[in-house]
Amino acid sequence: MTKVALYKQDGTQAGEVELADSIFAIEPNEAVVTDAVLMQRASLRQGTHSVKNRSTVSGGGRKPWRQKGTGNARQGSIRAPQWRGGAISMGPIPRPYAYKINRKAYRLALKSVLSDKVSAKNFVIIDELNFEKPSTKAIADSLNKLEATKKTLLVVDDANENAKLSARNLPNVQVTTASGVNVYDLVKAQKVVIVQSAVKQVEEVLG
């Protein structure tokens, strides 16, 4: 079992937490992580790009001049692709870019990134984040004491609404729940700060 330090909300160490080696101590598979990141980035694309082709561009129903006798090249419409203001041939049309990879591969990618964060000591476990009311200042103080001052992914349990509301105004902090942990967010974050109860939820899902 891999052991990681457990911290309190005030930044003091409260003990250690044992993590499952099958999730947090595997050999990272960079190829699978890359596939997972590309898949997530592709799903973020809107795919709303569109141009007008011969059937949608307006005008051009009349032949600009007769077929023969003018000395000009034959033309059938002023909206043909070679004309200025004409239609676009083989241009982009709206389409979804999203695709899926195998669930087994995605789970391996999650384990790979989590293992990399743990081995690099960029995985911080906190016993709890309790606030009587949402407070950006309070959660910023807690993260500063944990030395999570740069790009940080804060993972809380699903029921911790005050922590989610407190952290959403911090520019370098992205907050998510244990059920919403994904490869792209983990890769982007320099440090992961996770509540102990959320660790158990992650282990239940990936175990």
Curated annotation (Swiss-Prot):
It comes from the Bacteria. Keywords: Ribonucleoprotein, Ribosomal protein, RNA-binding, rRNA-binding. Pfam families: Ribosomal_L4. One of its GO terms (cellular component) is ribosome. One of its GO terms (molecular function) is structural constituent of ribosome. Gene3D superfamilies: 3.40.1370.10. Residues 45-57 have a biased composition (Polar residues). InterPro entries: Ribosomal_uL4, Ribosomal_uL4-like, Ribosomal_uL4_dom_sf. GO terms for biological process: translation. The keyword RNA-binding applies. Residues 45-77 are annotated as: Disordered. Belongs to the universal ribosomal protein uL4 family. Part of the 50S ribosomal subunit. HAMAP family: Ribosomal_uL4_B. One of the primary rRNA binding proteins, this protein initially binds near the 5'-end of the 23S rRNA. It is important during the early stages of 50S assembly. It makes multiple contacts with different domains of the 23S rRNA in the assembled 50S subunit and ribosome. This is Large ribosomal subunit protein uL4.
